[in-house]
A protein has these predicted regions:
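N-terminal targeting signals for export/organelle localization
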Residues: 1-41, 174
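Conserved hydrophobic/aromatic "anchor" residues
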Residues: 40, 64-65, 107, 115
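Short pre-active-site segment immediately N-terminal to redox-active cysteine/selenocysteine motifs
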Residues: 58-60, 64-68, 100, 137
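Thiol/disulfide oxidoreductase modules built on the thioredoxin-like
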Residues: 109-113, 120-168
């Protein structure tokens, strides 16, 4: 009887801990106040440095991803479609790959990505952490308004529908 009680207790604790970790990873990180996006620069696949200020004045969706991450790869076709549809309205996607360059080059060669992909590697992981990705998970997405303020941080997959609920009002701001 004692052993059964111990097993049940351990199972309940494991269940509660698992739910807490799952909630931390999959739940959107809501932020009540907008904070400025820190400036940083990263290279593209050709080695050319790009600063975030290149896209100042646009609503930016900054997505940290990796080629080995199934949810990351699932998001990308929707992001590509939304970039095509809303680019002229002020939306700009930026992908920050947390991979080595070779797998990223291979991925880009076989997929039609229509937004800039920057190479984050180790520096990208630190930047994601500084932006609020405290558990170093991918995908991790940061949404920035036209004024350069972070309005949303999302750990885990983000659907096009969820994204547009956040982005649509931002695109209408002056």
């Amino acid at each position: 009887m004692r052993q059964s009680a111990l097993i049940v207790t351990v199972a309940v604790i494991a269940l509660i801990a698992g739910m807490g970790v799952r909630g931390l990873i999959s739940a959107p990180m809501n932020q009540s106040s907008q904070t400025p996006l820190p400036e940083f620069s990263l290279p593209d696949l050709s080695g050319k440095q790009h600063s975030l200020s290149e896209w100042q004045g646009r609503v930016r969706v900054i997505n940290f991803w990796a080629t080995w991450c199934p949810p990351c790869l699932k998001e990308m076709p929707e992001f590509t479609a939304l970039q095509s549809q809303y680019s002229d309205k002020g939306l700009q996607f930026l992908g920050i790959a947390l991979d080595d360059p070779e797998p990223v080059k291979e991925f880009i060669a076989t997929h039609k990505i229509n937004y800039p992909i920057l190479m984050g590697q180790d520096q990208g992981t630190k930047i994601a952490h500084d932006l609020g990705n405290l558990v170093d998970t991918v995908p991790f997405t940061v949404i920035v308004n036209k004024k350069g303020q972070i309005v949303k941080r999302q750990m885990g997959e983000l659907t096009g529908e969820q994204l547009m609920e956040i982005v649509t009002p931002l695109l209408q701001e002056k």
